[in-house]
A protein has these predicted regions:
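GNAT-family acyltransferases
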Residues: 1-106, 177-183
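Amphipathic alpha-helical recognition patches that constitute DNA-binding helices
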Residues: 22, 97, 115, 132, ...
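Active-site acidic-Proline motif in GNAT/NAT acetyltransferases
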Residues: 104-106, 110, 139-140
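Conserved acetyl-CoA-binding loop-helix of GNAT-fold acetyltransferases
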Residues: 109-123, 145-150
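Short glycine/proline-centered loop/turn elements that form peptide/ligand docking sites
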Residues: 113, 117, 140-144, 161-166
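Conserved GNAT acetyl-CoA-binding A-motif
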Residues: 126-136
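Conserved catalytic-core motifs of GNAT/GCN5-like acyltransferases
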Residues: 134-137, 154-171
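Conserved active-site tyrosine of GNAT-family acetyltransferases
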Residues: 148, 153, 175
Length: 183
């Protein structure tokens, strides 16, 4: 699968095993890992390899995980920017959980995450026929909260002191978006 975005040279494609080095470096970066609600510590290379192997092998058909890739206009060489996902797609309720990570610091703040997130949501609504996309985010992840609100996600609730990290209890925020709300 190959999905273009609104930024020239930025597209979404299927994850591949040769993405392991970039994928692994982010999974092991403590600053990136601290933004994930699903893990408290960076993943080992073995854990990361297992996760990537499951994704590439189609072990979770209810989920779509795509690489965010920037192609050099002169060389055509790919730069692996991040991963965007629609997980736990429900076949009756027609909703899925959204997730995104921009792994390379040099690619942050350039609009790549917003373009990739919007494209993935459009794919979810138009191709997968979802009626709702939802997500959760740790409350102190201000950059992510800002992105989601800019895309039209609406705040649905707060799980107070739900997530223990770095010796502190953190709130977990829940957001969702319907097709008519996506910006």
């Amino acid at each position: 699968m190959l999905l273009p975005t609104t930024i020239d040279g930025l597209f979404l494609r299927d994850l591949r095993m040769d993405d392991f080095d970039g994928f692994s470096s982010w999974q092991q970066d403590p600053e990136i890992a601290r933004c994930f609600a699903f893990t408290r510590t960076p993943r080992t290379q073995d854990e990361t390899r297992r996760v990537l192997t499951e994704i590439v092998g189609g072990a979770h058909p209810e989920s779509v995980h795509l690489a965010i890739v920037l192609t050099g206009q002169e060389t055509g060489e790919e730069s692996f920017v991040g991963v965007v996902s629609l997980k736990n797609r429900h076949p009756i309720d027609l909703h899925a959980e959204f997730a995104i990570v921009i792994g390379a610091g040099a690619h942050m703040g350039k609009g790549y995450g917003k373009a990739a997130a919007r494209r993935m949501c459009l794919y979810g609504f138009e191709t997968l026929r979802l009626r709702k996309i939802y997500l959760n985010v740790i409350a102190d992840n201000v950059r992510a909260v800002r992105l989601y609100e800019e895309l039209g996600f609406r705040f649905e609730g707060r799980f107070r002191e739900h997530f223990f990290r770095d010796g502190v209890w953190n709130d977990l925020l829940w957001y969702s978006v319907f097709p008519s709300e996506l910006r």
